[in-house]
Amino acid sequence: MNRKLMAVILSGALAASIMTPFSAAAADDTILLWVPEATQTFTEQQIEAFKEANPDYAGYTYKVEPVGEGDAANNMLTDVEAGADLFNFAQDQLARLVSAMALTPASDEDKGWITEQNDENSVAAATLSDMVYAYPLTSDNGYFLYYDKSVVSDPSTLEGILADCEAAGKGFYMEINSGWYQTAFFFATGAELSYETDAAGAFTSANVTYASDEGVAALKAMIALAKSSAFNNGSSISNATNVGAIVDGTWDSGAAKDLFGDNYACAKLPTFNVDGTDYQMSGFGGFKLLGIKPQTDPDKLAACKALAKFLSSEEVQVARYEAAGWGPSNKAAQQNEAVQADVALTALAEQLQYSIPQGQYPNDYWTQATALGDSVIGGDYNDADDAALLEVLQNFQDTCIGYAG
């Protein structure tokens, strides 16, 4: 063989042997990401920073497609193999995605990093049966109290807030005929309501303890609230009038600032008192997570894990807050000056300590919860004793359990 030709072959072989992890041996050198449209450009910019900081993975082709959290989860459940390598999803889809084998569980090392970096509730939202399956991105979906500080002198108790609103002729808004907001009372007293699903999303079992002393205490608190002259059923500050205080979320922070002006203030949800016992209001919390699809190529998996770690890091979570307003789950990012100055996010972060990550619930549950709340608002239980309220809750509980299995 010609010596020059041999030299070319050998040099080519040597070059191939030192190629970066995306080498031609990989089955696929494209990494596909699904993110909400609002963060597509941001994510593309961060990937460029990732490649610059991680030259070993710069040779992969990174493709970012705009797919919302709900659609991303549904698409993965439909066809895992055709799905994105990394995708955003809401925590209520975790169990289904795990059952469908659509998520790569974190290694012990990665689990340690995720747990160390992020707040306890977001880590819990990414965990199933003691296994961490995703990288938390946010702790920013839930509800808390917006109030007019010229009206409400102390937002720590529901009784005090109502008294201040009544005295000022102002309204207190909370949507107690919503199964989402209603849990603020029931979970506060220790009542439980949750469901298990299979990979197809079918509800297989239910854990409901509303028919209990805890449930009766929660229902009595709702009845007392509805009796207040300040009470208004609602959760959208844009649709509210003459507001002294409202239970709402970060999505309405702009409208709240416009409404309250210099008197704009926020706080965690208050306590309420039933029969001499104080309960801290609870409720549902929501978290955005970043999942990795199982990979057959270990080099590509390493790249995906490095990218997930980068996109969920302190620096990127702060940048994402500044670009899109997403509230960080990263504990250090939560202490960032700009994040700390956001009083709505600060109030929500405090409230999420008392909230429960929302799982999946049957559509019929939401309808049933609305009916219960409507009966409270309508005064149907105003004269009911504890035994009668327990019967109401037993019927509610039996109906909810019947939605599973």
Model feature map: region roles:
Residues 91-143, 156-162, 266-268:
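Hinge/lid segment of periplasmic solute-binding proteins
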